[in-house]
Design a protein with these regions (language model features):
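Short strand-connecting beta-turns/loops that link adjacent beta-strands
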Residues: 41-42, 71
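Conserved metal-binding segment of the jelly-roll/cupin
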Residues: 50-70
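Double-stranded beta-helix
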Residues: 65-91
């Protein structure tokens, strides 16, 4: 995701909106980094900084958002097959 090109800007807009997935989200950070903000059980934000070489696993239905810190490459690992859908939280 390159936040400096048009496709990257669209991805940044989408990933920075608070959302959840029915399945766990497993990400490997290939290059660059950024911040995952994740809601805890009390609905408070917890910020996790990720960088190249990190692996992060978000539990199913955990509301979260991602903010890149410059250009970032991430890969998603699917535990149960490729079905990527997001449910966005209303403001």
């Amino acid at each position: 995701m390159d936040p400096f090109d048009s496709e990257g800007r669209a991805l940044v807009r989408e990933s920075s909106r608070e959302h959840q997935h029915e399945e766990e989200e497993i990400r490997v950070i290939g290059e660059g980094g950024g911040f995952f903000d994740i809601r805890d059980l009390q609905d408070t934000w917890v910020r996790v900084q990720v960088q190249a070489g990190d692996l992060i696993v978000l539990p199913p239905k955990a509301y979260h958002r991602f903010t890149p810190k410059g250009k970032v490459e991430m890969r998603r690992i699917y535990a149960t097959g490729v079905d990527y859908s997001a449910v966005f939280r209303e403001a």
